Amino acid sequence: MAKATTIKIKLLSTADTGFFYVTTKNSRTMTDKMTKTKYDPVAKKHVEFKETKIK
């Protein structure tokens, strides 16, 4: 079997609320760490989310 190209990642809020999203990314085309601006319902505003490992 071939190695999967899509992997699951965790996007953790930079507002230190502990809120996170789980999404997928293509590990072959996106080799750097992913950052996205998304809504954090704990902070009640849009903040930047950075990629971390799923434990």
From Swiss-Prot:
Gene3D superfamilies found in the cross-reference section: Ribosomal protein L33 (2.20.28.120)
Keyword Repressor: no
Gene Ontology CC annotation, any one: cytosolic large ribosomal subunit
A GO BP entry: translation
Family annotation (SUPFAM superfamilies): Zn-binding ribosomal proteins (SSF57829)
PROSITE patterns per record: RIBOSOMAL_L33 (PS00582)
Keywords for the protein's UniProt record, in alphabetical order: Ribonucleoprotein, Ribosomal protein
InterPro entries, alphabetized: Ribosomal_bL33, Ribosomal_bL33_CS, Ribosomal_bL33_sf, Ribosomal_zn-bd
Pfam families: Ribosomal_L33
Record-level Gene Ontology MF annotations: structural constituent of ribosome
Similarity-based family: Belongs to the bacterial ribosomal protein bL33 family.
Protein known as: Large ribosomal subunit protein bL33
Lineage: Bacteria, Pseudomonadati, Pseudomonadota, Alphaproteobacteria, Hyphomicrobiales
Gene (UniProt): rpmG
